[in-house]
């Protein structure tokens, strides 16, 4: 019981900064038809209701592709695509409207009761739908008439903002009308992307069948920049994937990132609570798409002393690192490089140059426990090498008692104490008996 209480307290402490940061912000959530079909949809709806109760302004955009296809098959209506875009003739349009209308009612009903059987029972959630999107036809391409398949002509952002300010969740479906009163079938990814851009949303969030974007080892890629997103799209297309919820969202996320949407998140609709884990934890659970990495490597300054101390004190107590006083750190802070993630220092290292011998010491290497099975150590080493070269140093050495093999795997070789610069040799602690490893930079 005590362990569970401790976990709850720690989890809440870690979540509070994100609760405060997200309050009042606009999030666009894209629910694919596949996500709506899946058994965990009730959990997703409950989490959306919880986000609303925390003061986050929500626009929910839903798709209905599998539901439309099911309707068409039931009515024996041919399903036609051109360049991976549905051709919506009059017969198909009726089934599109039927599927979209049914989902609108279902999602509205579920959101309205999402906080029942919770401590927030009794809190009302207003869900508003309307003609927020004005559509226009896609027209004819290569002799193929898309009929009632359309694209966005304009978005009534004033009306959407008005509903958000009144505390409502705005729900937008895939059917929109034109200035002539005709109905058109739009893609949910276009709506979600353009709404995110026009309303200057903080985040665009999508759901897929996997835990975000998966690499060749089967692991989730936690962060992608636009160029990397494009590479992932090419990989998926190379496998014949042109219309999955993953690739559709990735295409939209590139436009969103380049147009000012801070972050786009892709998470699994299979995983219960994925939405909350992604938004209220430092590392999330899926893949986020950003213009600029949430993680930065930079030279430390005096304001980073507290973060460095939190990182190195546990290692000093274990005898892994030599103890440094706060005063010493303050005098030497310009020697330190840190990796920072969401204002948390997650790794550090220092470079002490010996200009006479043209050698540098890499020291005080520390990585936060949550990130030790990652590449942060390699990133620090690479940065230390670059910094040393800028100072015209020819070699780097380290003194270590615990990480001998790690450095050897990266090209360092064991050397004798006599190789050290004279001033460092005089300070060598023979009782500690640290191993000395060195690497040539040129």
From Swiss-Prot:
<keyword id="KW-0028">Amino-acid biosynthesis</keyword>
<dbReference type="Pfam" id="PF00696">
    <property type="entry name" value="AA_kinase"/>
</dbReference>
<comment type="similarity">
    <text>Belongs to the acetyltransferase family. ArgA subfamily.</text>
</comment>
<keyword id="KW-0055">Arginine biosynthesis</keyword>
<dbReference type="InterPro" id="IPR016181">
    <property type="entry name" value="Acyl_CoA_acyltransferase"/>
</dbReference>
<dbReference type="GO" id="GO:0004042">
    <property type="term" value="F:L-glutamate N-acetyltransferase activity"/>
</dbReference>
<dbReference type="InterPro" id="IPR036393">
    <property type="entry name" value="AceGlu_kinase-like_sf"/>
</dbReference>
<keyword id="KW-0012">Acyltransferase</keyword>
<dbReference type="InterPro" id="IPR033719">
    <property type="entry name" value="NAGS_kin"/>
</dbReference>
<dbReference type="GO" id="GO:0005737">
    <property type="term" value="C:cytoplasm"/>
</dbReference>
<dbReference type="InterPro" id="IPR001048">
    <property type="entry name" value="Asp/Glu/Uridylate_kinase"/>
</dbReference>
<dbReference type="GO" id="GO:0006526">
    <property type="term" value="P:L-arginine biosynthetic process"/>
</dbReference>
<comment type="pathway">
    <text>Amino-acid biosynthesis; L-arginine biosynthesis; N(2)-acetyl-L-ornithine from L-glutamate: step 1/4.</text>
</comment>
<comment type="subunit">
    <text>Homohexamer.</text>
</comment>
<keyword id="KW-0808">Transferase</keyword>
<dbReference type="InterPro" id="IPR000182">
    <property type="entry name" value="GNAT_dom"/>
</dbReference>
<feature type="domain" description="N-acetyltransferase">
    <location>
        <begin position="295"/>
        <end position="442"/>
    </location>
</feature>
<keyword id="KW-0963">Cytoplasm</keyword>
<dbReference type="Pfam" id="PF13508">
    <property type="entry name" value="Acetyltransf_7"/>
</dbReference>
<protein>
    <recommendedName>
        <fullName>Amino-acid acetyltransferase</fullName>
        <ecNumber>2.3.1.1</ecNumber>
    </recommendedName>
</protein>
<dbReference type="InterPro" id="IPR010167">
    <property type="entry name" value="NH2A_AcTrfase"/>
</dbReference>
